[in-house]
Amino acid sequence: MMEAMDTQTPTYSNDELTAALAEHLASLDRDDSYRVERVLKRSSVETTELVYFEGTGGGSLGPFVRKRIDASAQIGGAYERLFAAQRAGRRFEHLPRIVDCRRVGDELNVVMEYIEGETLEALVDRLGATPDYARELYPALCDAVGELHAGFAIAGETSAPVIHRDLKPSNIIVTGANYTPDDGLTFSSLVIIDLGIARVWRDGADADTVKFGTRPYAPPEQYGFGQTSVRSDVYALGALLFFCLTGVDPKPGLDMREQCEARGIPTSLADAVCMSMALDPAKRFASAEALGLSLIH
């Protein structure tokens, strides 16, 4: 199950979240203030829960998403950087609002806003695969990844790209999506979730310290053949474009041009998929922005 569920549940604005939680989060017993509604996802290194914050006066706020990450797994650092940037006043259109992030013993606990909507996976399943996604939704997805790549630097810091490393249909939340033949695909917002294995790019590094990912969407360098970079996420964006156009994941190890032809993808879109998913990072689009612009012009 994904973070975006129960679309009838009310949500709160950023200001409401901050004002309502500020007093309670000053307590040293924060964990005791959260009621776990249910577990959304569990792995060997991370548990994702749907929680409500129980106030001292008996009221509650929520829902929120809480991630409890094993600190020994060396993941989750992007949440800490995002939290610091948001507390410093930065706002991100395509990333979740973090309301609490701290280390407790050997865990990193992250509490964030609950995003209403449906995953890209569910959206394509509901509406079907169509080239309209490339014209309407996909440029917004490239903008969202570009926002991540711009980094989380605050005043006085040098900005460095944040590489998601696990872009896939279940980690993209779309709100208010609707499709008609006359209007095409319309939607309200698009948010990237699950920054657990995201990492900051390091100049001079030869390879990533921790290797994770989802096989159809992960480039070769993510498995020890070099350091991941913004072009690694461009590879995943190419795979996401293939998914939007076909409704299926690309098959690793098979020629992408042949896969596109077999699915009847228009040549201009197939060119974008194949260039994005080139095995050599140097042959891919240089940025998410460049990929997005190639679909507009």
Regions found by a protein language model. Give the residues of each.
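Conserved HxN/HPN-centered segment at the entrance to the catalytic loop
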Residues: R91-D100
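Conserved catalytic-loop aspartate of Hanks-type protein kinases
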Residues: D233
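Conserved small/polar residues in nucleotide/adenosyl-binding loops
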Residues: I296-H297
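ATP-binding glycine-rich loop module of kinase domains
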Residues: S44-Y79
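Conserved short submotifs of the Hanks-type protein kinase catalytic core
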Residues: G105-T119
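Conserved activation segment of eukaryotic-like protein kinases, specifically the C-terminal portion
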Residues: A207-E221
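Catalytic-loop of the protein kinase fold
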Residues: H149-T175
